[in-house]
Structures are given as structure tokens and as C-alpha cells.
């Protein structure tokens, strides 16, 4: 199946967890993103507020490990949080500071 799974989101880096490394030495950074916006749904304005766990791998993980409190624009895909949890986690493929 070739379903799309693409996420683009502007959010605040609410929390940054300590960086860790895979057995292969790849940096892994888990963060919590906080988003708030007004969206139109069924012709009505709707306030959307959410927090979502996210993960950054590789060189970008090291670059963002001290950036808590920064607004960012991220692009990535949703995946299960772990082998034992089907809760969603945003896997970030591209992250940049949000300039508004």
C-alpha cells in the first residue's frame, strides 16, 4: 500500500530530553512539541491545541539538543512510539527555526 504519511507543523519545542545514542552510534533526541492555532472545520473556527512527542535522528539531533523554548517548523511522518506502544510519535526529517 502506498498511503501518504506526511506531517508539516509549526510548534514550540516544549521539552527536550537528554540525547542518547543507538548501539551504532547514531544520536537520538526525543522532544515534545506544543502547537496552537486556529483552523477552519465545517465552516467554523476551531482552536487547536496539542502536544506531540517527536524524535530527531542523526546530526540534527545534536544540533537541536539545547534548543528548548524555540519555535520551529518541522516536516516528517507519524510512526508508533515504540515496539510496545501504538501511540503516535512524529519522526522529524526536517527541522528549522520558525521565523513567522
From Swiss-Prot:
UniProt superkingdom: Bacteria
Subunit structure: Homodimer. Interacts with PriA and DnaT. Component of the replication restart primosome. Primosome assembly occurs via a 'hand-off' mechanism. PriA binds to replication forks, subsequently PriB then DnaT bind; DnaT then displaces ssDNA to generate the helicase loading substrate.
This protein's encoding gene: priB
GO biological process, one term: DNA replication, synthesis of primer
Organism ancestry: Bacteria, Pseudomonadati, Pseudomonadota, Betaproteobacteria, Neisseriales
NCBIfam families: PriB_gamma
GO molecular function terms noted in the UniProt entry: single-stranded DNA binding
HAMAP family xrefs: PriB
A Pfam family matched in the record: SSB_1
Family the UniProt entry places it in: Belongs to the PriB family.
GO cellular component: primosome complex
Domain SSB: residue ranges: 1-99
Function, in words: Involved in the restart of stalled replication forks, which reloads the replicative helicase on sites other than the origin of replication; the PriA-PriB pathway is the major replication restart pathway. During primosome assembly it facilitates complex formation between PriA and DnaT on DNA; stabilizes PriA on DNA. Stimulates the DNA unwinding activity of PriA helicase.
UniProt keyword annotations, A-Z: DNA replication, DNA-binding, Primosome
Species this protein is from: Neisseria meningitidis serogroup B (strain ATCC BAA-335 / MC58)
Name of the molecule in the record: Replication restart protein PriB
